[in-house]
Amino acid sequence: MAIRNKPRGALTVAAPIIFLAFMLAGWWLTTTLTGIEAWRLPDPFAVARKGLALLQRPATWRQIAVTGGEAIAGCALGTVVALPLAYAIYRWRLLAAAVEPFLGATQALPAIAIAPILVLWVGYGITPVIVLCALMVFFPILVSTVVGLRHIDSELLEAAALDGAAGWTMAAHMELPLAAPAILGGLRNGFALSVTGAVVGEMVMGGSGLGQVLTQMRSNVDTAGMFVVIAILCIMATILYVIVYRIERSKRYAITQ
């Protein structure tokens, strides 16, 4: 079985690298053959040079840390609020009937529309950015947790109840562990949205992270720099996504064993 998994593992690593290489080649050919202005679309080498220059500045790493910290703090806050509410919705049908019709509508609200309201309520700075990140991750985690809890095999819960499990014991030792893959799936998507929320929040509500850098570069028509910041944000979101995905895979494996 391990031998059969090796080609699949190699393909998992190679496929995105090959895809990225094709994307970069197409990008370079577009800038070379069309003669498009550099301020509209810089070539990949110009972006790479700009990226190396930015990464040599200590300020860039501080800005990355600020945005990453806001995203992680917001995701943690959203998770702490979403999990108890999700369990309450799962347990009490009346609460589910009251809340669930509004979940779809609230998920449709764009972050850029929520940010000005947070400024009025909380003011400028890091706090409203973290709150915005929390709102971005709250609904995916809430919905995925409710779905995961509702799809637990009822026979397992009945067997646990026969052994005396009830209340907090049932939740801690049966329901939440069995729903962990779904919870982590929501958390995985939530982290990516949290990075988006941090950037949007910084652009609208101020701050000292990558969102402010992106705003300054837009004002200076520094397109190569904007591409670099976008690439850094993508890498940050990907790293967080992969970390939670690995945890999710390990949980799934543990449950199947």
List each model region and its residues:
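Glycine-rich helix-loop "coupling/hinge" segments at transmembrane-helix boundaries
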Residues: V119-W121, T196-L233, A254-Q257
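Periplasmic/extracellular loop-to-transmembrane helix junction in inner-membrane transport proteins
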Residues: I3-R4, L33-A76
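Transmembrane-helix boundary motif in ABC transporter permease subunits
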Residues: A73-L103
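Transmembrane alpha-helical segments of polytopic membrane transport and secretion proteins
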Residues: M1-F19, V242-Q257
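Short helix-to-coil transition segments within interhelical loops
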Residues: L149-E155, A159-A179, S219
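Transmembrane alpha-helices
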Residues: V131-L135, W168-G201
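Generic hydrophobic transmembrane alpha-helix motif, especially the helices
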Residues: G104-P140, V147-G148
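C-terminal transmembrane helix and the adjacent membrane-cytosol boundary/short C-terminal tail
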Residues: R93, R150, P181, G185, ...
